[in-house]
Structure formats: structure tokens, C-alpha cells
Amino acid sequence: MNSKLLYRIGIVAMSAMLAVAVYLALVFYPILVESAEEDIDVVFRALFPFISIFIAPVAGLVLYLRKKPAGLTLCAGYAIFMTAASVFCIGLTEFNVANVLTVILYLASAVVYLLPQSRFSFAPDSSPVDNALNSLMWAVLLVFIVIGPVLLPARYIGMIVGLVLLLLVLRGFVGLKK
């Protein structure tokens, strides 16, 4: 597969995730708010994901279409958030499994197209700082994706997404200095 095809796959996958986000917002948000009544914790858990649903994918997709690195960072954070939120808040259904597969497809195509392969490998010629950042980034991502949705309250997911985004941005700056 060439990079142009991978870029197009990324656009299609991100657009599909935006459609999924809008669908989830239209279907589940009124149910969550109605069931919350006066419980502020439930209202917070309902509001935070849906705010990100309308801001992050639109901004990320626009940046991605303009081939800006910030688009990848924003979309990757959104994809991780949506995957975790789908599993944590709604549970595994056929619809959510399709959403997770779309997330994986998007991330794979975006990473292959926009980032040099050396940034995600442990090459002998890489500096110890590069290898340490690679290890830290993958460890945070794996812990967040696998353990985060099970152990953490929904309000902390945003903080972890922020940490992941920060790591990705820092990793990008280190890579640009080469």
C-alpha cells in the first residue's frame, strides 16, 4: 500500500468515527441526562465525552486534511478517548467493536503516513532519550487503553488523554530536531 492510499484510509476512518460520535451523542446523551436527574457526577460523566465528541474530531479532521502534525495528535487522542469511553460507559456491543476497529484502522494509517518509522522503533542508532520516550509513550498508551477504562473514574480519563497528548507532542518535537 502506498502512502496516498493510507492517507485516504485515515480520512475515511476519521470521518466514520465522527459519524459514530454524532450518532452516540444523538442517541445516548438524552438518556444519560434524563437518568442523571440531580446526580452531578452522572451529569459530568455525560457532558465531558460529548463535548469532546463535537470539538476534537472536527478540529482533528481539518488539521489532518491539511497534513498538519497537530491533526494526528488531536485525532489520536480522540481515538483513544472514544475507544476507552465506548468500553467504559456503554460496554462491548457489535456497534462498539466496529468503532474500536475503526479507531485501530485510523491510527495505523495515520501513524504510517505521517510519522517516520524510526520514531516508533528501537533502533540501535537512536539516542537513549529517544528510546526512553518511545518506551514511556507506549507504556502510557497501553496502560490507558487496557487498564484505564476498568479502574479509573470517567472524570480522570480526560486527564490521562491530556498526558498522552503531551507525550505525543513532546515526542514530535524531539523527532523534529533530528
Question: What function would you assign to each model-found segment?
Answer:
Residues M1-K178:
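Topology signature of small-to-medium multi-pass alpha-helical membrane proteins
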